[in-house]
Regions:
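Short basic helix-loop element that most often maps to the first helix and adjoining turn
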Residues: 3-22
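Residues in the helix-turn-helix
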Residues: 18, 29, 58
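Recognition helix of helix-turn-helix/homeodomain-like DNA-binding domains
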Residues: 25-38
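DNA major-groove recognition helix of helix-turn-helix/homeodomain DNA-binding modules
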Residues: 43-58
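Short amphipathic recognition helices of helix-turn-helix/homeodomain-type DNA-binding modules
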Residues: 60-63
Length: 63
């Protein structure tokens, strides 16, 4: 699964830590998602989409 988390985070000028705090996960979880090493739960994907104001399928795509 590929994602645009790093890009969306840069557009909003958020650090990994700031994003992690907003969605209530660790900074390491955000790093793992950005690196493609971790696929987030549905709940986490929805929280991330809410932070960025985008649809889940605009942020996460199957390869």
């Amino acid at each position: 699964m590929i994602n645009t988390i790093r890009i969306e985070r840069a557009v909003q000028r958020l650090t990994q830590q700031q994003l992690a705090e907003r969605v209530q996960v660790s900074r390491q979880t955000i790093h793992a998602i950005e690196a493609g090493k971790y696929v987030p739960s549905t709940v986490l994907a929805l929280k991330l989409s809410a932070v960025f104001g985008k649809k889940v399928n605009d942020i996460f795509m199957l390869e």
